[in-house]
Amino acid sequence: MNHSSGTLYIVSAPSGAGKTSLVTALTKDDQQIRVSVSHTTRAMRPGEQHGVNYHFVVHEEFKALIAQGDFLEHAEVFGNFYGTSRSALQQTLDQGYDLILEIDWQGAQQVRKLMPQALSVFILPPSQEALRHRLDGRGQDSEEIIAGRMKEAVSEMVHYDEYDYVIINDDFDTALADLKAVFRSNRLLLKKQQQRHAALLKQMIG
């Protein structure tokens, strides 16, 4: 493990844009990246695991954590609450890992105020038609829910210009390569390289 601290990344997207699939593929290829496990009050979906996908808690417990100041950010989405543990986040960064927060624009605004050094990425679908097709293809939700999420997606996408990077997920492999490029280019910044290779640089140039 290197001696440089990790970078905090915010990754946001409307539901159905492919954010989760892209982040999953990214972390499989890069062992230096971790994904923050958020707390949520929503019901567990088939295939999900407590402590892996989310920390699933009841509303009363979530409100208690807010009162204790345990969340870096928290937001309400579709009637459910989501929040990010402040202490767990900092511990991961201190270990030298890059950390991804998969949060919406509301959470992103909160995080930027407290950690302005965070880099942010917004993932867009190629069109509203493609987004609706992806939502329909899930087969998990009713037409009413899909219509509501389409409306919510538009209100989410309005905030794309608040982010440092924008990736359009038309072709998955291309979008994944773009996401990898964001992480790799940041690691090559002068400050990061000076931290990572301090001993080597001192040996070469004194």
From Swiss-Prot:
Enzyme class of the recorded protein, top EC level: transferase
Organism of provenance: Pseudomonas putida (strain ATCC 47054 / DSM 6125 / CFBP 8728 / NCIMB 11950 / KT2440)
EC number, as in UniProt: 2.7.4.8
InterPro entries linked: GK/Ca_channel_bsu (IPR008145), Guanylate_kin-like_dom (IPR008144), Guanylate_kinase (IPR017665), Guanylate_kinase_CS (IPR020590), P-loop_NTPase (IPR027417)
PANTHER family in the record: GUANYLATE KINASE, GUANYLATE KINASE-RELATED
Localization (cell): Cytoplasm
Name the record gives this protein: Guanylate kinase
Domain Guanylate kinase-like: 6-184
Catalysis performed (reactions): GMP + ATP = GDP + ADP
Physiological role: Essential for recycling GMP and indirectly, cGMP.
Sites where the protein binds ATP: 13-20
HAMAP family (alphabetical): Guanylate_kinase (MF_00328)
Predominant localisation class: cytoplasm
Family recorded in the similarity comment: Belongs to the guanylate kinase family.
This protein's UniProt keywords: ATP-binding, Cytoplasm, Kinase, Nucleotide-binding, Transferase
Gene Ontology molecular-function annotations: ATP binding; guanylate kinase activity
Gene Ontology cellular component annotations, sorted alphabetically: cytosol
Classification via CDD domains: GMPK
